[in-house]
Structure formats: structure tokens, C-alpha cells
């Protein structure tokens, strides 16, 4: 361990891999507190679809960066990094171990390494104006929206396919918020870590993972996911960026009478599997992770291996 830097444990892995359970049991062993590294669990009222840890599951372990925003608020890697750094300092100063658990690769990477991320924070009044301008573009088809982006950021338009509507909208939103071009944004990674980091990941065969994902979706639906999405739509959150998350965007067309339920469930499972694949690709290509084989290791075996590395 590097005594000159704060020590943190980071647990990554794809959706449905068991990060929550491992992080809680590890926190019990090493006197830790958990910081969520998930971009969606920050939102209130979005519990089932984000697989948010419940108070019962927490079992007395403090959790941070959960339920801190409303669904119409925005959240970025910049905000996550700023808040997580403050939490790490506070937790460390109280003699406890910060454990960051989550599957949002950019958030984890920005925290561990010296990323320079620009502040996209705007006032509520400015955000309202940005939302109005984005709403005015909703009627445009993908090509028209792409052409609009090209008018002020040709480089981003060149690098983003017209059918990738979400990325096109992201580039437009960035410009409306900052008056800067997304293509010029600086994101510099130094090859030194901010912390003395034990970076762990949970892995398993694709067949096992996909089976766990399909089962989890069924459980979410049994626990009321459809009603959760329905309530968010009724509260006026349908057009919010947070509602583009997997688990929410697939069910909105059912609520609006545009798709049958069974097709939406199939889409939800497929999108979840595709997301898990992207997560694993990110972690394996961009980060140096010590992998724990969930298929061949029990929870206790994983905990024993982790605590051995910490000592």
C-alpha cells in the first residue's frame, strides 16, 4: 500500500454480476463505506430499473451518491468525480475505507486517474432554456438532427453516425450548455493514479451472465418495474435524459400504446445484455483490473482473496 495516497477499493463489473453483494460484505470486513459508481442510482424514484440497493440490503453499511437528484436533473462524470473525491477524503479522515462500486466505466476511470473534465453545471434557469431548445428539436428526424449539429460542430458530426441520435443530442446539448464544441473538449488522462487503488472486477462466462441478466429483468418486472416507469411518466419525467436509461426507455412505448408488452420485455433483455458486453469491453480494454471468477469462487473465497491483498 502507498501511504502517500488515500487507499480505496474499487469493484467493477457488468450489470447483474453481483457488485452490490460483494461490496457490502467487504465493507463489513474492512470497516468500509460504499460510494456508488453508477450513473443512474443518483436519481430518486428510479429504484427497480436501476437495481438500486435497498435499505435492507445495505445492512447498516453507509452508502453514498444514491437518491441525491430528481429525474429531471443532469449528472455527469465531472459531478461524480467532484462529489466522490470529497467523500473519499471524508471517509478516509474518519478512519474508514472508501469502497467504490459500480458499472459506469467513465465515472470510475475519471476518479482513479487524473482526468481533466469540464464543468457542465448550469443554473436551473439556464437548464430550462437548454431543455426548451432540445424539445424544439424533437420533431427532427435523425438526418435532420445530424445536419443541425454539423452547422456548428462539423468535427463531431463527422465522427458521429446520424442514426446514433443519443450521441448527436449529447453533442448539441454540450454546445447549448457551454457554448463550446464537444469535439474540442479536453479530456486528458495522466498515467498516474490519484489514489492507492485496489481495482477489482467480477467476471463470469457470457452464458452465465446473460442468464443472470434475463432472470434479473424478470424479477424487476415482478417487483413492479412497469408501474415505476408509469408513475415517472405520470409525474412528467418522460422526456428527461434519465428516462433514456435501459429499463425505462423500453417500457415507455408500451405505456403510450406504441408497442406490445412482450416485445418491450424482449428489447429490455437484449439491451441489457448488449450493455453488459460493452461494460466488459470497457473494463478489459481501458483499465487494469484484478478479476474475480464468480463461477469458480464463492463469495467467501472472493472476500478472503481481497482481504489478503489489502494486508
From Swiss-Prot:
Residue segments, region Interaction with substrate tRNA: 38-41, 166-170
Subunit structure: Monomer.
Family: Belongs to the IPP transferase family.
Top-level EC class as recorded in UniProt: transferase
Species name: Staphylococcus aureus (strain NCTC 8325 / PS 47)
Gene: miaA
Name by which UniProt lists this protein: tRNA dimethylallyltransferase
MF-aspect GO terms: ATP binding; tRNA dimethylallyltransferase activity
Role this protein plays: Catalyzes the transfer of a dimethylallyl group onto the adenine at position 37 in tRNAs that read codons beginning with uridine, leading to the formation of N6-(dimethylallyl)adenosine (i(6)A).
HAMAP family cross-referenced by the UniProt entry: IPP_trans
Amino acid at each position: 500500500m502507498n501511504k502517500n495516497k488515500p487507499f480505496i477499493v474499487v469493484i467493477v463489473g457488468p450489470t447483474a454480476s453481483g457488485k452490490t453483494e460483494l461490496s457490502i460484505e467487504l465493507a463489513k470486513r474492512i470497516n468500509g463505506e460504499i460510494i456508488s459508481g453508477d450513473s443512474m442510482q443518483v436519481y430518486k424514484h428510479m429504484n427497480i430499473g436501476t437495481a438500486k440497493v435497498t435499505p435492507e440490503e445495505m445492512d447498516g453499511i453507509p452508502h453514498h451518491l444514491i437518491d441525491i437528484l430528481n429525474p429531471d436533473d443532469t449528472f455527469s462524470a465531472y459531478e461524480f468525480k467532484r462529489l466522490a473525491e470529497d467523500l473519499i477524503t471524508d471517509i478516509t479522515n474518519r478512519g474508514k475505507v472508501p469502497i467504490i462500486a459500480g458499472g459506469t466505466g467513465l465515472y470510475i476511470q475519471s476518479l482513479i486517474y487524473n482526468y481533466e473534465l469540464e464543468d457542465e453545471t448550469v443554473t436551473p434557469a439556464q437548464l430550462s432554456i437548454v431543455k426548451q431548445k432540445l424539445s424544439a428539436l424533437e420533431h427532427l428526424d435523425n438526418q435532420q438532427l445530424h445536419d443541425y449539429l454539423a452547422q456548428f460542430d462539423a468535427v463531431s458530426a463527422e465522427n458521429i453516425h446520424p442514426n446514433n441520435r443519443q450521441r448527436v443530442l449529447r453533442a448539441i446539448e454540450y454546445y447549448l450548455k457551454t457554448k463550446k464544441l464537444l469535439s474540442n473538449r479536453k479530456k486528458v488522462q495522466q498515467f498516474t493514479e490519484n489514489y492507492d487503488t485496489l481495482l477489482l472486477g467480477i467476471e463470469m462466462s457470457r452464458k452465465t451472465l446473460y442468464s443472470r441478466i434475463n432472470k434479473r429483468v424478470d424479477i424487476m418486472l415482478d417487483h413492479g418495474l412497469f408501474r415505476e416507469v408509469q408513475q415517472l411518466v405520470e409525474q412528467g419525467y418522460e422526456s428527461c435524459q434519465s428516462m433514456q436509461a435501459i429499463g425505462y426507455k423500453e417500457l415507455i412505448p408500451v405505456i403510450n400504446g406504441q408497442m406490445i408488452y412482450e416485445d418491450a420485455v424482449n428489447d429490455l433483455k437484449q439491451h441489457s445484455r448488449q450493455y453488459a458486453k460493452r461494460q466488459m469491453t470497457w473494463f478489459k480494454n481501458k483499465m487494469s483490473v484484478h478479476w474475480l471468477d464468480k463461477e469458480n469462487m464463492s463469495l467467501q473465497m472472493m472476500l478472503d482473496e481481497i482481504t489478503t491483498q489489502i494486508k
